[in-house]
């Protein structure tokens, strides 16, 4: 270590430190240099007398280090290394690690101690999270802020204890720690990554950002669309921070080819040239901070650390400080005299957070006169930073591309002349700005010749302009551009009303006028006739999916409403014409970035030949800056437009009655129903579903072997007919009304429970278990091979939905394509009522069964009555299983899905007999001949030409569809599937 003194600075060299970060404590006594092996503590009062070391064992460099800014905690500092933060304690010449903060999953990019609360520390990381820690409880962060992109910078507000700012690539977000769910404000600050962010020391709304895009920008987050001022540079800016005195700013550039390693001191109110340059470092300046001002001294010291391994302390005397406060220092007396006339500051989004400053005493005013760069002077200056500092700057930043407006500005005379052309009218106005503008002093407006509007219109325009200007200047905001836009909008509105009234005094008022001759207007001639019914572009939507997720999208974060929330949103393209008058703007963008879009707001930029349509509703916003850097000019045209909102996937499985864990634990053992119910009850207990434990316990009792039905129907009534049999099970499904949402109403159900809960998981599992319990021995499903009753079985096919023979249990034919019917029937067709009042599924789904032997019918009825599941509701039970199988598929439980779908009933192929009996396709009555004697309709209808078939015809024996022989032959020369679209492969099933 060596020390060199000069009149300007102190240089201390640390040859082997390899430090990557530096910080100065709040007392101005010590600086810490963070190396990979050691932390070096330097006494700034005697830097040449040596330094102390704190050893550390880590393979990661320290990314950020900072002392606690509070005097009572001045011996604490924090250092980030990879994914953790170490809290060090330095006292009595020795240091140690107090505790470690661990929570981030990626590298920590920045940290910052709270200005008002000594126990709070905020950290930002690439993992998209910003954590606020309380060092009294370091187990987990007290507040977590989440963003889509990782944060590179985080800084607490120096005036508001609840606000902080973070940078994400080129964007800045303002957060309120009391509302961590979303950011208070979003700013699209730069086109490239932001390297530095710093709050103004005397204004809670102002901050500066430095970026890779070769610029430093000054912002007021109350006006997120436009920066207050900009400092253009030739190279990227590494850091930009405010000085503790006056209105200064220090910047460090990213050197190109190691040529520029100086620090520049700027006057923030005059950015034409730096007021001082700190030259001396031979390599990149990594960090710089200010020492606390010593008692009795007006000098400040700037401490810098560079990659050349030198620590330098630069003295900033009173004369240099005056360079950063030029115009304010000259008007100190005027400021003191007019301090009582200053308007109240604008309310922040949370007025209760503002700390009201006490009034000044006479002694304090004397101190201000003696020492101009005081906090009150800076506060006055910071109030002015909310807007362009001078009228000339406002003139330079104004958007002169307002249609039909010409503005002649004279900054020296503090006035401007505005000329507006609208239809056949011309308005010329002189606007004069007082010396106090915009500090609660509104400009004056005066119409001058030539002005062609009436006196009544003049009075209305003057009132509107005065109201608009007063609203702005009360908040110390500039008002020229808002007044110009208001002038144009109102004038166009008056002219439109005048034209519509004079063109036809007996016609009804029309809100959309014909094109004006002087400039492009939007008419009702839309792109096409159907455009009038095109809905307005959707800004949000939501959908649930079967896997337990909610997928929704919102409007882009870069857009917000320009009107009150009560303003209706246009629902069609024709309603959009109301916005073309310029009186209302549906949306406006939050940023001036050229790559962004904003919604059309009554300022058409297209020619008269172009028509309005939904596709032309969005357009690129015109650049408002008069100049741009070379980088922006070359890349902005090719940069992709990003105006879409975010698509968010939310896990809502906790709100659903189905559980993935239950799907994994449930079993279906067809060989032991008792074991299945017992194990499923245990699984329900594991996930905390006590109601399901009771259900499965009841199922265990109901499936006991001692309750099994007898084979002889005369011995006893089956247990399923007992009140605790089928009726108890149906009480779990739901009543008639509640089950309509799940499918057809269940017969005999009395209580509404699991269908009301939409618990398809429990419904499907119970159906599968009791289906397995009630299956006849050796029969795979209740619709197994039919007994050989070809002589007396009637299987009627109709145009109603029926299963096909494609091998899939879920493939069904479309009822709309069936044009004819057929049956394989016996000679006798009689219907005998059931003694139990039951109807079989075959009767409901496949036609009517006729028995020649009453005992055979009685046995079949007994088989139905001994089932715990009502065969009449088989279709609904199958729907439960298919729905649950779809959920299992989305969960990735394919084996469990296959087990459940095994219990879906598959209807058998229809019996193919020899005799043919014809049923009418309209009234379903038996027909002899080509015409029905009951309804007088034709029996057959060709599936190709849809004309009644009288002569030669051919029909498929599987699906029953057909038609004229010539038509069928022509169709199946090139096709293989039935022409009705039922999916039947007729050529494979029968021969034509």
UniProtKB/Swiss-Prot annotation:
<feature type="binding site">
    <location>
        <position position="956"/>
    </location>
    <ligand>
        <name>Zn(2+) 3</name>
    </ligand>
</feature>
<dbReference type="GO" id="GO:0061700">
    <property type="term" value="C:GATOR2 complex"/>
</dbReference>
<dbReference type="InterPro" id="IPR019775">
    <property type="entry name" value="WD40_repeat_CS"/>
</dbReference>
<feature type="repeat" description="WD 8">
    <location>
        <begin position="660"/>
        <end position="706"/>
    </location>
</feature>
<keyword id="KW-0853">WD repeat</keyword>
<feature type="modified residue" description="Phosphoserine">
    <location>
        <position position="840"/>
    </location>
</feature>
<feature type="binding site">
    <location>
        <position position="961"/>
    </location>
    <ligand>
        <name>Zn(2+) 4</name>
    </ligand>
</feature>
<dbReference type="GO" id="GO:0008270">
    <property type="term" value="F:zinc ion binding"/>
</dbReference>
<dbReference type="GO" id="GO:0034198">
    <property type="term" value="P:cellular response to amino acid starvation"/>
</dbReference>
<feature type="region of interest" description="Disordered">
    <location>
        <begin position="343"/>
        <end position="373"/>
    </location>
</feature>
<keyword id="KW-0863">Zinc-finger</keyword>
<dbReference type="InterPro" id="IPR039456">
    <property type="entry name" value="WDR59_mRING-H2-C3H3C2"/>
</dbReference>
<keyword id="KW-0472">Membrane</keyword>
<keyword id="KW-0677">Repeat</keyword>
<comment type="similarity">
    <text>Belongs to the WD repeat WDR59 family.</text>
</comment>
<feature type="compositionally biased region" description="Basic and acidic residues">
    <location>
        <begin position="853"/>
        <end position="869"/>
    </location>
</feature>
<feature type="binding site">
    <location>
        <position position="923"/>
    </location>
    <ligand>
        <name>Zn(2+) 1</name>
    </ligand>
</feature>
<dbReference type="GO" id="GO:1904263">
    <property type="term" value="P:positive regulation of TORC1 signaling"/>
</dbReference>
<dbReference type="Pfam" id="PF00400">
    <property type="entry name" value="WD40"/>
</dbReference>
<dbReference type="InterPro" id="IPR001680">
    <property type="entry name" value="WD40_rpt"/>
</dbReference>
<feature type="binding site">
    <location>
        <position position="945"/>
    </location>
    <ligand>
        <name>Zn(2+) 2</name>
    </ligand>
</feature>
<feature type="repeat" description="WD 3">
    <location>
        <begin position="146"/>
        <end position="185"/>
    </location>
</feature>
<dbReference type="InterPro" id="IPR049567">
    <property type="entry name" value="WDR59-like"/>
</dbReference>
<dbReference type="GO" id="GO:0005829">
    <property type="term" value="C:cytosol"/>
</dbReference>
<comment type="function">
    <text>As a component of the GATOR2 complex, functions as an activator of the amino acid-sensing branch of the mTORC1 signaling pathway. The GATOR2 complex indirectly activates mTORC1 through the inhibition of the GATOR1 subcomplex. GATOR2 probably acts as an E3 ubiquitin-protein ligase toward GATOR1. In the presence of abundant amino acids, the GATOR2 complex mediates ubiquitination of the NPRL2 core component of the GATOR1 complex, leading to GATOR1 inactivation. In the absence of amino acids, GATOR2 is inhibited, activating the GATOR1 complex.</text>
</comment>
<feature type="repeat" description="WD 7">
    <location>
        <begin position="319"/>
        <end position="362"/>
    </location>
</feature>
<feature type="region of interest" description="Disordered">
    <location>
        <begin position="849"/>
        <end position="870"/>
    </location>
</feature>
<keyword id="KW-0479">Metal-binding</keyword>
<dbReference type="GO" id="GO:0072659">
    <property type="term" value="P:protein localization to plasma membrane"/>
</dbReference>
<dbReference type="GO" id="GO:0005765">
    <property type="term" value="C:lysosomal membrane"/>
</dbReference>
<feature type="repeat" description="WD 4">
    <location>
        <begin position="189"/>
        <end position="229"/>
    </location>
</feature>
<dbReference type="GO" id="GO:0031669">
    <property type="term" value="P:cellular response to nutrient levels"/>
</dbReference>
<feature type="modified residue" description="Phosphoserine">
    <location>
        <position position="839"/>
    </location>
</feature>
<feature type="compositionally biased region" description="Basic and acidic residues">
    <location>
        <begin position="344"/>
        <end position="373"/>
    </location>
</feature>
<dbReference type="Pfam" id="PF17120">
    <property type="entry name" value="zf-RING_16"/>
</dbReference>
<feature type="zinc finger region" description="C4-type">
    <location>
        <begin position="919"/>
        <end position="939"/>
    </location>
</feature>
<feature type="binding site">
    <location>
        <position position="986"/>
    </location>
    <ligand>
        <name>Zn(2+) 3</name>
    </ligand>
</feature>
<feature type="binding site">
    <location>
        <position position="964"/>
    </location>
    <ligand>
        <name>Zn(2+) 2</name>
    </ligand>
</feature>
<feature type="modified residue" description="Phosphoserine">
    <location>
        <position position="848"/>
    </location>
</feature>
<feature type="binding site">
    <location>
        <position position="982"/>
    </location>
    <ligand>
        <name>Zn(2+) 4</name>
    </ligand>
</feature>
<feature type="repeat" description="WD 6">
    <location>
        <begin position="278"/>
        <end position="318"/>
    </location>
</feature>
<feature type="repeat" description="WD 2">
    <location>
        <begin position="103"/>
        <end position="143"/>
    </location>
</feature>
